[in-house]
Design a protein with these regions (language model features):
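Short beta-strand segments
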Residues: 18-20, 35, 156
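Acidic/polar active-site rim loop that often engages polyanionic ligands
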Residues: 26-35, 143
Length: 173
């Protein structure tokens, strides 16, 4: 629900904060988007930040219109990672691994890669390049995944834009 709609309901003189947490907050590793209206006082803002930071990181926004992108990237983002884990596990099984073997490899690969991206000063592209040997196995896989016509860049763009559009539609309800 947008802040201006809440102001219409409870009054423009009230302190109102819109937040968008994501599921990893359940493990204290989430990220919460925050947008405050003009009535939120500095002490209220500070106290809210302390509370929300207990669940992970926070990102404060000046423009509420960015919440549709936030929802598509961060709110829905865990599902995208879960789908990747699901697909990688399934392919592992198809290549002869047991479910337990494949899933253990996948979940620890995702956990380790997540730790690398969070704790590194390198951008994701550089981390990817560091793992990719020219002509190697990763190079071959990425050539398929990054195909401009039907690869992941096109699929991810379409999917995340669809989520952002749906967020816009839902915020009008």
């Amino acid at each position: 629900i947008k802040i201006n709609r809440l102001e219409d309901i409870i009054g423009k003189d009230e302190s109102i904060v819109r937040i968008m947490p994501n599921l990893p907050a359940d493990r204290l590793k989430g990220v919460t988007a925050v947008k405050e209206n003009k009535r939120v006082e500095p002490k209220q803002s500070k106290n809210l930040a302390l509370l929300l930071e207990a669940f992970g990181e926070t990102v404060k926004f000046v423009e509420e219109r960015k919440f549709d992108a936030v929802t598509a990237i961060s709110g829905s983002g865990p599902a995208y990672i879960f789908l990747i884990a699901e697909l990688m596990t399934e392919v592992g099984i198809n290549l002869g691994l047991s479910y337990d073997e494949a899933f253990k490899l996948v979940k620890h690969t995702i956990d380790g890669a997540g730790s690398l991206i969070v704790n590194s000063s390198l951008k994701p592209q550089k981390l990817r390049e560091n793992v990719t040997s020219p002509g190697g196995t990763t190079h071959e896989a990425l050539a398929v995944m990054m195909n401009k016509d039907n690869g992941l860049p096109k699929i991810f763009s379409a999917a995340i834009k669809a989520a952002a559009q749906r967020s816009k539609e839902l915020s009008k309800v």
